[in-house]
Amino acid sequence: MSKIPGSNLEFVREEDFVEYYIFPKIPDNVQDEGALRKLMLQIRNEISAIVREKSLERSYLWHKDEFQLQVRLGGAEERLLNEETNPEEEAELGDLPPHFHGVTHYGDNISDEWFVVYLLTEITRARGDCIARVSDSDGEFLLIEAADALPDWASPETCEQRVYLVGGHLQLLQNSAASSQDKPLTMAMAVQRIRMNPTLYRCSQEIQSCIDARLKEYQIAQPHFSIHRQVLELPHSAAQLLKQKPRLLSSAVRAFCERDSLDIKALRTMRYFPPEATRVRTNVRFTRCLYAMLSHQQYLPEKRLGWHLTDPVSEPERYKEQLLGLKLASGLEILATQAKRVEGQQLEDLPAWRSYLRSLLSKGYFRDNIEGSAEYQELLNKAKVYFRGNQERFRTASRAGAEILDLLLHPAEAASEELRDEENNLQPSDSDEWLNISAEDLDSMLQDRYGPKKLYKPNGQMNAEEFTKQLAEFLDRQSNYEGIEHRGLEEPELDSDDDEPPPQANGSTGLTAKVKKNPSMRKACQRNSVIQPEEPDSTHVRNFLDFVIPEDNWDSTSEMSDYADEDDMESNLNALSGGGSVFPLDRQIQSYMEQMDRELAQTSVGKSFHGKKKTAPQADEDDFDDIEDFEPININVNTLRNMMDSYQSQVGGAGPVSNLFSAMGVGMSAVEDKEQKDISESAV
């Protein structure tokens, strides 16, 4: 598992986690640690009330871990216990101010990650003094969501630890062009900058709209659309337990879906949840993710245990209720068995504790104290308390199993009464047709989310001007190991990082720390360190698109339009010659080109170009009857027409134009391939 600066409890972390920080504003007069902790606990209670309200309004079910916050005062010993730093990383991360920290594992349900973002947005909106930061195993995933709207300077390297939520809005602290790429901005420095000017770093509306669109499903104060209600037939003890602790449902489903050979052995006896002669029917709320996981698990119980199922053909709905019920009861059985297996295990026997202790030793937590001394033992006891407390933060299988065993020993009579009342007033199960999706629906969803840009206006005509603009922008880019980049664009003047050193006079910041640590990538970068000059083909196409169209000079002897001034002519000739350095053009060649213009003007080649619309003649144009048929060439329309003709000649197959369209992010549907679109001046 890769180390992330500022990460928490690395030894229990999986890849599917989201990590978040909340920095409240602490008054200057609160200096005492006891008073500070009391204030932090009070603020946490207020934040927890907001989270509870939003979760209940939406009847939200967590897939694995819930949203939770731990108080962090930012002390050095606390950070060592929390596995946040190595001694050599202290200068990089800086001293964090008092804050709340949380980690939520979302498993297979990505909705939990975005619900965390929604909660942080609402918390910072309700409490304007709070600044929040959120990231996951991919880093700044909020910027990944808004990738199409980011400024040119934004990249994973330049934006590390620079994305924050303030007042319900996304803020991105810009990096200085003179800053070091190997040293990310510390969170303490970022929070300080935002405090100084809370609105300076607010993202553009386009970026904010990308995030708001992703959070739209959570903003309605009603049960979330992902909730699926299903009637199940369960053993009475299992149904009673789920009424007492509905959150055990997700642990049971995951345990059943992830069962191993030891778990299957436990299912052959069903010691804790035997299939009783009379089972109860009850309403159970799933998330769609959990329901899909449970439904698609292939499992048939042993009949000798007493799992009698109805005929799936004659009573399919009743069969589904029974089959899903026995799967869920089996998951609860697995959890109880796992907890019983480790019930008497000592802390020193846990692999996680041994790994945690080794980590503390390597980071100098015990200082120079001799093992067994009073100081050493005091620090060791602190570490044990801290370890146990943090283990209880997460919904591990053993913790859920221990909770099940405790509830079986102390059943609640109120839950039994609720079951009896509910059995006479069962709500019907929700339709699960959403499980079935056709290929056409999937294609439509992918097209809406990731589909290429269209060239058509709402009236069905093609936008020639937009097409040539996209083509010119695409050709004006260069490629290296990081992908296609804009060429020739100067970096904007950005805020300076006071804590970051200036660059070397002749240094380059192109190689990031990740590249330096990766030998294969470093070699690839060295091979590509010299950027090759542009290909002649792309240069010529760009020059054609940028060609200056002069005003007509009616006094010219040429039969086609001449150049209105000498500067335009020189710029066009230099453009076609590559700047005059590769193919120098003298006056004799220029005269040849002018003669060719005159000869081609009245030929089929000259007439094949699409011209611009003629405007009504003015009073002072009566003397130009001899050139009334002249139409200036429309570069945009002619470029698009030629590209479309070439595309149609490929009959939808691979070829130069379709490959260019794909690289530009431009798509042509099958229907559009067959129809002849109106490519005219009105389309521009």
Curated annotation (Swiss-Prot):
Tissue and organ distribution: Expressed in the ecdysone-producing larval ring gland, nervous system, imaginal disks and gonads.
InterPro entries named in the record: Ecd (IPR010770)
Gene, per the UniProt record: ecd
GO CC entries: cytoplasm; nucleus
Family annotation (PANTHER family): PROTEIN ECDYSONELESS HOMOLOG, SGT1 PROTEIN HSGT1 SUPPRESSOR OF GCR2
Protein name: Protein ecdysoneless
Function: Required in both the follicle cells and the germline for oocyte development.
GO molecular function: snRNP binding
